[in-house]
């Protein structure tokens, strides 16, 4: 990456936001492959499984714009930290799912706390990378998806 002209600090920031968004992205997509097992274990119908998956995206869609505003108001570092810690807690709580409603609420909340992540990561890139570096930095950042 030194050929691109990134400093060590910039590389550290880029790796950090890349890993942060990767975690958020995996949270978003991993459940689709788990749904056959979840449906069977929790006696979900196919329709319940579909709406269960959709709960994340409903929460995410609600929080993307306010999450970006929140990152601007309180800072992207704090927003990323709170989002990651909240994702960890909610993911741990998912191991206690015993019914559809509880699982749906947790998926929805996971979407809510994941919403600010992308905007916060892009704010960090905006702060640490100059105008001639941002395109490459954003391209590398988005490669985790």
Predicted segments with their positions:
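Small-residue-rich segments within alpha-helical transmembrane domains of MFS-like 12-TM solute carriers
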Residues: 25, 29, 95, 111-119
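Residue-level signature of mid-helix packing/kink "hotspots" within the transmembrane helices
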Residues: 29, 57-65
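Extracytoplasmic
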Residues: 12-46
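Conserved MFS/SLC helix-loop-helix module at the cytosolic interface between two early adjacent transmembrane helices
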Residues: 62-101
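Juxtamembrane helix-start elements in MFS-like secondary transporters
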Residues: 45-53
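Cytoplasmic helix-loop-helix junction between adjacent transmembrane helices
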Residues: 106-144
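Helical-face signature of the major facilitator-like transporter fold
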Residues: 20-25, 57, 91, 99-111
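Transmembrane alpha-helical cores of Major Facilitator Superfamily
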Residues: 22, 54-58, 85, 108, ...
